[in-house]
């Protein structure tokens, strides 16, 4: 028989840096999950990624207090900021441009995020990433 799901917990945790402090500790402690067990498993799964990169994770907590988790790809905005070499997006994206990204960089980000995005082709995913870039005040160059 399948385990009964008690809760889904969605968090963004820095790759390889999960620890029992907030936001991980309170969110999982509230559900009765062994926090250190999650931290060790998450850090082991994300050790190949760049340390400190925020990774969205969905934790499924079962009634017997066991858990499973699925890691997603980093948010598009984080990957775009890294590609453009900026700290943050523009406060006024239509007026103030803060950086530039090339179509090749947009394609690379779209391919990285392909598993988590909807859309039939890589071109539609690239359009979505380019839209995110424009909303951050980045110029997409040919």
UniProtKB/Swiss-Prot annotation:
Protein's UniProt keywords contain Coiled coil: no
BP GO annotations: translation
Keyword Secreted in record: no
Post-translational modifications: One or more lysine residues are methylated.
Any one GO molecular-function label of the UniProt entry: structural constituent of ribosome
A GO cellular component entry from the record: cytosolic large ribosomal subunit
Domain of life: Bacteria
PROSITE patterns named in the record: RIBOSOMAL_L11 (PS00359)
Swiss-Prot/TrEMBL keywords: Methylation, Ribonucleoprotein, Ribosomal protein, RNA-binding, rRNA-binding
Function: Forms part of the ribosomal stalk which helps the ribosome interact with GTP-bound translation factors.
Subunit: Part of the ribosomal stalk of the 50S ribosomal subunit. Interacts with L10 and the large rRNA to form the base of the stalk. L10 forms an elongated spine to which L12 dimers bind in a sequential fashion forming a multimeric L10(L12)X complex.
Family: Belongs to the universal ribosomal protein uL11 family.
Record's protein name: Large ribosomal subunit protein uL11
Species the sequence originates in: Haemophilus influenzae (strain PittGG)
